[in-house]
């Protein structure tokens, strides 16, 4: 049984003025292009086609809002680190992202990282930005099915050391469903809280 049986797409946003009203609780999902973010969203919500999965980096170019339940939203952020993105696209993305801390309804960030690549400089910058905004941060080391058990354990340990205190980390695979229930539980906790100090 899905924990989010009534999840639905709300709208795509290309400009700050298109943001929906600030209400309820929201959690953002972010990650590098091709990190497995869309697959993670689909696995966690138990909806195979909720977020569009593409083999082409940079496919998600807008902020996509989804309603998980009344008063609970998920925000799918554009993937970053896409080398072929035009300057105007990067400027647009930056403008949208920088407006998010003003949303008092936004309480947490799920950061999706390809476990084979590990946490990069842009991931660290995003975590620092989220911490400054007062959000809780949870890191999904996605595509864990691509590594053997020993390499997964090593990647997990390194990620924990990089993230430090205050950031939760887990291994995750949308393919074999490793960590899906743990991610769902963490998402529900974030949606129920009011700040990183809760």
Task: Write out the residue ranges for each language-model feature.
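Conserved G1/Walker A P-loop phosphate-binding module
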Residues: 1-84
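Switch II of P-loop NTPase G domains
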Residues: 19, 57-64, 78-107, 115-129
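Canonical P-loop GTPase G-domain recognition
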Residues: 4-16, 146-198
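Conserved amphipathic alpha-helical interaction elements at protein-protein interfaces in regulatory
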Residues: 46-50, 132, 189, 193
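Conserved nucleotide-binding/hydrolysis micro-motifs of P-loop NTPases
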Residues: 59, 72, 79-81, 116-119, ...
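Residue-level signal for inorganic ion chemistry
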Residues: 66, 142, 183
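Helical mechanochemical/support elements of P-loop NTPase systems and associated helical scaffolds
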Residues: 49, 62, 73, 89-93, ...
């Amino acid at each position: 049984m899905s924990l989010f049986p009534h999840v639905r797409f709300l709208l795509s946003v290309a400009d700050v003025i298109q943001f929906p009203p600030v209400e309820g609780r929201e959690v953002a999902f972010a990650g590098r292009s091709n990190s497995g973010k869309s697959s993670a969203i689909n696995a966690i919500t138990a909806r195979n086609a909720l977020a569009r999965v593409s083999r082409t980096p940079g496919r998600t170019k807008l902020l996509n809002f989804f309603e998980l339940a009344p008063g609970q939203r998920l925000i799918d952020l554009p993937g970053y680190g896409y080398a072929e993105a035009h300057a105007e696209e990067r400027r647009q993305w930056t403008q949208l992202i920088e407006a998010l801390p003003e949303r008092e309804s936004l309480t947490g960030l799920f950061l999706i990282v390809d476990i084979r690549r590990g946490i990069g400089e842009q991931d660290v910058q995003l975590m620092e930005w989220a911490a400054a905004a007062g959000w809780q941060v949870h890191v999904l080391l996605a595509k864990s099915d691509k590594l053997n058990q020993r390499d997964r354990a090593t990647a997990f340990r390194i990620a924990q050391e990089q993230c430090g205190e205050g950031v939760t980390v887990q291994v995750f695979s949308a393919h074999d469903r490793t960590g899906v229930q743990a991610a769902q539980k963490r998402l529900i906790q974030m949606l129920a809280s009011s700040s990183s100090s809760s």
